[in-house]
């Protein structure tokens, strides 16, 4: 383990650092780059970048956050450090296994001189298992005060930079500082990580690009990310100039956590609209398929530490704080607000709502008191000073209008308040009010509920039933979990004022019922429950890491790891040519779009080069060549007229022609297309109401495609259409299927797989059982062909020793065992096979002439 921290930050940022790691024994693993399965060499086995497991068998958790869970103070020239008991990152260890070692990587809340950094790092590592990250002051300012607080924080809270003074326009230099800082965190993680035994849990928006640095270095690292702030809707997020870079960086995690479904839904929508990714929900788990990896989406609001609050409550009693406040507010009904000085906390809206209640319900004048505690601002900026001025002006106005000797309706506290005193306020408050206009979670209501439950048998224990009341903004993360709270739209000041009156006027019995319901939830869904649940899901989603072959692709933040079956490998042209030459009866099945022709090609007709290669292959008597496509038979017949001996399976095999001179035959079970009269009007209706969609009318099928429509609306319409068509076509001999941006209705039993089996069966029936199969395709419909080849072997439609090459175009998850990168490689392979056939035919002619 590393014992010293780096001080040369220029070397660190540029990546010039020594590779160090814990010693480990060598074990065979699947390689992380394309190639054969083998053991790593000695250098790889002892490199920190290796994916080999260590000799240490127990798991370890590395928690990476912007701030370490430490308090630091320098006294008389020496440093003093202690745990910050209120830090979430310290509290979450309660939910992790007792034997799991925990390391923390993060920065300190104080500046440390460069000549002291090594000594401080050693102390923190030895005594606290913390690895500090140190930054130059200018980088820290650009990273935290600049990009994090002026750009990401406002945007994630739905504030667009309409002007230079409103949220801050995008500054490329601040983004570069953000990336550089994330890279420094990465350098610290690799000092201590054992990539095969450790879990890495990254926290919050400060470190959103860190997953890319770690995934690039360690392809199989087990890594989770949790966002503690809101995630904005796609309409807001898309305004960020580096939107795709951040999304792709987050997707290098294995598990991404959010507090609420709304935040997760916004993230999934952004991935759909900006990256074209689709998510699936299986058995209660949401996952995004991303280049062979499943990125899990976790929805779990964080909880509080019950033990910590109980301890503080006990201490508050010992100090007499509770009794002191009860005496001070005797005869008054206390409402309580505790917020950071932040433009999103809605503090002034709360004051206006209190003013509204006092104006509309005079009976509360002289009785109701709102105690508003304001914590220091975490960020800097003109917005904070403006909102502070508004709050202070509202307090003066309301107290001036409704106050009297011995009574102030608003008690505004903007000086530091100890946690013991805050807990005492929780005890005496009849209602806690949270009016944030946007907030990630906000645990104030949870803390209040626990404090109102009290300590059994204590001096502050309520006589009679426990009760509490909440008025909570519907825009905070904890709101969905508190069904007994009065939810408000804080922008509607009048309605919020009425909610305050309702909360204070509610019967004690009703308050008791709501309190009991809330306490049951809060006490069972604490921070330990949250961290334990996250780790369990992270373990589940990473269980197959070492069963797949992984390699990295892309540069910069376009980097991603492709994870595929270890048996999935690139088709070697020399090897297949060698096997091709030895075969006596060959079947070659080729998809068209995306296989012989690029998908984005404007001219869809095959090139003369491709036609020449196919024609040469058809001239070989050992070959049976088929184009198997979803296209109509008219266009395919026209394009492949020069290849007289080529077979064509059109419309996914509904129509089949064995060669150019033969007639078309149908492979469907039914020739009745009356169902089209039902389907076409339905599709037309959805086309008219879905901009960007269209209908493709084939002889045997109807396809509704929405590739150019709004992804979210198109997907919604497709799902509704699918259900509608399945209902009205229940008694028709058709199959209704959804695909990649399509809904297709076609006759039952029609697929590329079924026509492939028919071809193999026919060749076997003619005494030419196939001993060589080459099948190439690029999309979902071609997966049926790949599956049919396996079925043909078990059904003995092929020779027992048949050589089978199922090949997909592009490196992606597939039932095929081989891949070629693109259509150019497919053409090169066809050229090599054609040359082999021509050479064989030439040899045969020479032999005939010699005889």
UniProtKB/Swiss-Prot annotation:
Region (Glycosyltransferase): 59-540
EC supergroup of this enzyme: transferase
Listed GO biological process terms: trehalose biosynthetic process
Pfam families in UniProt: Glyco_transf_20, Trehalose_PPase
EC number in record: 2.4.1.15
Gene Ontology MF: a single term: glycosyltransferase activity
PANTHER family: ALPHA,ALPHA-TREHALOSE-PHOSPHATE SYNTHASE [UDP-FORMING] 7-RELATED (PTHR10788:SF116), TREHALOSE-6-PHOSPHATE SYNTHASE (PTHR10788)
Family (UniProt): In the N-terminal section; belongs to the glycosyltransferase 20 family.
Protein name: Probable alpha,alpha-trehalose-phosphate synthase [UDP-forming] 7
Origin species: Arabidopsis thaliana (Mouse-ear cress)
Gene encoding the protein: TPS7
């Amino acid at each position: 383990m590393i014992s010293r921290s780096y001080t040369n930050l220029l070397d660190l940022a540029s990546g010039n650092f020594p590779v160090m790691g814990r010693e480990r024994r060598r074990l065979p693993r699947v390689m992380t780059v394309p190639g054969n399965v083998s053991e790593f060499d000695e250098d790889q086995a002892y490199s920190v970048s290796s994916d080999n497991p260590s000799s240490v068998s127990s798991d370890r958790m590395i928690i990476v956050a912007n701030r370490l869970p430490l308090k630091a103070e320098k006294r008389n020239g020496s440093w003093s450090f202690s745990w910050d008991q209120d830090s979430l990152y310290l509290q979450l260890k309660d939910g992790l296994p007792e034997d799991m070692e925990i390391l923390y990587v993060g920065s300190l809340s104080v500046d440390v001189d460069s000549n002291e950094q090594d000594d401080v790092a050693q102390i923190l590592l030895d005594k606290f298992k913390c690895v500090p990250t140190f930054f130059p002051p200018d980088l820290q300012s650009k990273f935290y005060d600049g990009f994090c607080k002026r750009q990401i924080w406002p945007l994630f809270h739905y504030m667009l930079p309409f002007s230079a003074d409103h949220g801050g326009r995008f500054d490329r230099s601040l983004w570069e500082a953000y990336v550089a800082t994330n890279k420094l965190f990465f350098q610290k993680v690799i000092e201590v990580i054992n990539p095969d035994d450790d879990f890495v849990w990254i926290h919050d928006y400060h470190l959103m690009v860190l997953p890319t640095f770690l995934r690039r270095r360690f392809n199989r690292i087990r890594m989770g990310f949790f966002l503690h702030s809101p995630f904005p809707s796609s309409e807001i997020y898309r305004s960020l100039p580096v939107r795709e870079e951040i999304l792709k960086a987050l997707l290098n995690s294995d598990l991404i956590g959010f507090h609420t479904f709304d935040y997760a839904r916004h993230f999934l929508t952004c991935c759909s609209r900006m990256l074209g990714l689709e998510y699936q929900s299986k058995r209660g788990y949401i996952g995004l398929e991303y280049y062979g990896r499943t990125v899990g989406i976790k929805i779990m609001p964080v909880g509080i530490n019950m033990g910590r609050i109980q301890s503080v409550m006990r201490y508050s009693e010992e100090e007499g704080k509770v009794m002191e406040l009860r005496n001070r507010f005797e005869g008054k009904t206390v409402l309580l607000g505790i917020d950071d000085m932040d433009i999103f906390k809605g503090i002034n809206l709360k004051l206006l709502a209190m003013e509204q209640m006092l104006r509309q319900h005079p009976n509360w004048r002289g009785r109701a008191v709102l105690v508003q505690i304001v914590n220091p601002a975490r960020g800097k900026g003109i917005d904070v000073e403006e909102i502070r001025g508004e709050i202070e002006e509202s307090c003066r106005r309301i107290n001036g209008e409704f106050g009297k000797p011995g009574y102030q309706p608003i008690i505004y506290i903007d000086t530091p308040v100890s946690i013991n005193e805050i807990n005492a306020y929780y005890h005496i408050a009849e209602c806690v009010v949270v009016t944030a206009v946007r907030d990630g979670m906000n645990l104030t209501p949870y803390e209040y509920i626990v404090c109102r439950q009290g300590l059994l048998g204590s001096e502050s224990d309520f006589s009679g039933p426990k009760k509490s009341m909440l008025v909570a903004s519907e825009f905070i993360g904890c709101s969905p979990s508190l069904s007994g709270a009065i939810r408000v739209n804080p922008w509607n000041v009048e309605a919020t004022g009425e909610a305050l009156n309702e909360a204070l006027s509610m019967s004690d019995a009703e308050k008791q019922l709501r309190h009991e319901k809330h306490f049951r939830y809060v006490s069972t869904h604490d921070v330990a429950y949250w961290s334990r649940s996250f780790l369990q899901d992270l373990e589940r989603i990473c269980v197959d890491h070492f069963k797949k072959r992984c390699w990295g692709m892309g540069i910069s933040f376009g980097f991603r790891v492709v994870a595929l079956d270890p048996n999935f490998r690139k088709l070697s042209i020399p090897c297949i040519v060698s096997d091709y030459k030895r075969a006596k009866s060959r079947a070659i099945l080729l998809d068209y779009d995306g296989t012989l022709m690029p998908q984005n090609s404007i001219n869809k007709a095959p090139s003369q080069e491709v036609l020449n290669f196919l024609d040469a292959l058809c001239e070989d008597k050992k070959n049976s060549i088929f184009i198997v496509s979803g296209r109509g038979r008219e266009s395919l017949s026209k394009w492949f007229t020069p290849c007289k001996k080529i077979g064509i399976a059109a419309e996914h095999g509904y129509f089949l022609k064995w060669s150019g001179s033969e007639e078309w035959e149908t492979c469907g079970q039914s020739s009745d297309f009356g169902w089209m009269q039902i389907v076409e009007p339905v599709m037309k209706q959805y086309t008219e109401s879905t901009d960007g969609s269209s209908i493709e009318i084939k002889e045997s099928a109807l396809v509704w495609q929405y590739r150019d429509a709004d992804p979210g609306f198109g997907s919604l319409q497709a799902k509704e259409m699918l259900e509608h068509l399945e209902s009205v076509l229940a008694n028709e001999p058709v199959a209704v299927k959804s695909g990649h941006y399509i809904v297709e209705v076609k006759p039952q039993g029609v697929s590329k797989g079924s026509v492939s089996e028919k071809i193999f069966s026919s060749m076997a029936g003619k005494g030419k059982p196939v001993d060589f199969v080459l099948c190439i395709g690029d999309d979902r419909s071609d997966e049926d062909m790949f599956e049919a080849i396996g079925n043909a072997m078990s059904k003995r439609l092929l020779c027992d020793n048949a050589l089978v090459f199922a090949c997909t175009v592009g490196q992606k998850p597939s039932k095929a065992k081989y891949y070629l990168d693109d259509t150019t490689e497919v053409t090169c392979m066809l050229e090599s096979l054609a040359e082999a056939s021509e050479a064989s035919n030439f040899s045969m002619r020479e032999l005939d002439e010699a005889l």
